[in-house]
Structure formats: C-alpha cells, structure tokens
Design a protein with these regions (language model features):
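Basic/polar N-terminal segments that are highly enriched at the extreme N-terminus
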Residues: 1-4
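N-terminal beta-loop-helix "entrance" segment that forms/cooperates
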Residues: 46-60
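Short, catalytically relevant binding-site loops at active-site mouths
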Residues: 14-16, 45-48
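Histidine-anchored nucleotide/phosphate-binding helix
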Residues: 21-34, 40
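Short, glycine-rich nucleotide/cofactor-binding loops
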Residues: 7-22, 53-54
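Short internal beta-strands
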Residues: 38-43, 80-82
Length: 82
C-alpha cells in the first residue's frame, strides 16, 4: 500500500479475552510506526476496557500491557471511539 492510509480498528473483545482485547491497540501502534493514521472503535464488551481498574488488569499474550498500549495511542493522538 503506497502512501498514508487511514485505518479503523474495531475491538469487541473484553477482559475475558485479553489477547483479542489488545489487538486494536497493538495494530494501531504498528500502523503509526508504518506512517498511517489509525483510529480505534470499541464496541460491546470492549468498552469496559476503558475503565481504569479493567485496563490496569489486562495483560495480552506477547504484547505490552493494555494500559501501556492505551497510553501510547493516546499520547500519539489516535482517535478512540467508545
């Protein structure tokens, strides 16, 4: 893909599946590193991930902690829709 793409990542998994819950954030960070403009939309159970107590407890497999990934996308001004 040439150029700068705008990509929407949709998350529906909640804390019961921490690895799937982390995918939108992990993918958005990868898109940022590749020079694209990611956005994240959280629906259903994924909306609960934005609660501080839940966010701090979610540790996806083979990814940084959810809180660290959320902090990264927020610091990089990635739009986050809940």
């Amino acid at each position: 893909m040439a150029g700068n793409a705008k990509i929407l990542y949709v998350g529906t998994a909640g804390s019961d599946d921490p690895t799937r819950a982390g995918f939108p954030f992990n993918f958005a960070i990868g898109a940022l590193e590749a020079g694209h403009q990611p956005e994240i939309f959280l629906a259903g159970e994924a909306a609960y991930l934005m609660l501080d107590v839940v966010m701090g407890a979610v540790q996806p497999v083979a990814m940084p902690a959810l809180k660290d990934m959320v902090d990264t996308v927020v610091a990089r001004s990635v739009p986050l829709y809940v």
